Amino acid sequence: MKEAKRKKLEEKGWKVGTVAEFLDLTPEETTLIEIKLALSRHLKERRQKSMTQTVLAEKLHSSQPRIAKAENGDASVSIELLIRAMLATGATPQEIGEVIAQVG
């Protein structure tokens, strides 16, 4: 948010902060969320290049709606499923590590 806009809101009595502050997240929780979102974005990019959500779901013995949730960063999706899905699209452990390393 631009500083001028922040000041105007604060002058009108609004409290301005980050999502992490609002949700009272620890730095570790914030980083974990950022990692999951990065994995979700990269999963969607990789999957769109090579297969449908249905095909990926079949490879993982999962469902298409679950893959959609994984690609959209749904909080109910585990990091394990995200990593398994990335591997099923052909990602290497090194590529997955690079995605995680870019967070922060």
Where are the predicted features?
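DNA major-groove recognition helix of helix-turn-helix/homeodomain DNA-binding modules
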Residues: S78-I96
